[in-house]
Amino acid sequence: MSIFAAFILAAAVGITEILPVSGSGHLYILAKILGVPVSSGVFLSFRAMICLGTGFAGILFYRTQIWDMLRENLVLLGLLRPAGRQRGVPFARRLGQLLFFSTLPMVPALLLNGLRTRIEQGDGTLAIIAVLLCCSGAVLYYVSRSARGKRNIHQITLADALTAGAVQILSVLPGLSRVALSLSVLLGRGLETSAAVEFAGLMGIPAFLGAGIVQLFGASSGGESFASAPLLILGFALSALAGYFTLRVFTERMAERKPSGFAYWSWGAAILALILFLVSA
């Protein structure tokens, strides 16, 4: 893998993993365009590192909320003293607990990482990605256009968290966007767009980190991976940088708009994947 290819792939995935357009689908499409072998150990290690980089971007962006959630739950466990007298359950404590429960359905999904690898190494992968990108875009378009949610982030429920977490299992398939699916569920259940975007963003952190760790252990590149360490470091850094700034822009824009427009992006990527499939057939 060249430095140019690593730069393009890391930056693109750092952006598309944050947006509701399927980072895995874009990674495979761009790898095919750039001639990067997706079955090589270096590519699998690189994919893991850009996944970890995107997760790190989420930690950096949501660092205040993460610290508040961690602190309040440590207070609950008696490991920290409360800052002052508190009435009721602090919101950060409850949000942290909801985030924990939303992560539970992702555990079996991480074990299905091998399924994604087998799909990506098949002959009809581009066609599968094209179909799934269309489906992901269609769901997001319909739900975000029809939803009239009014509930803010303080009103999110355990059912919201569990449902949004469960639907993330489908994102193991390349072309199905984790963000699009979780946003669609949260919007469909009555959350306002800004609340859905924030909770989906927080949910992405353990999802990215967990997937990155599993993929890193699953990549069997040995010495080849060690020799490509500069590319892996570059991938981590670029995906983290791109992911952080994408989070800033995305959360600001979605405070005033609906995410339905990203469906057109997914459909455009689906057309490109289909063209590549037909050309290579």
Predicted features and spans:
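Multi-pass membrane proteins that catalyze or facilitate reactions on polyprenyl-/lipid-phosphate substrates
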Residues: M1-A281
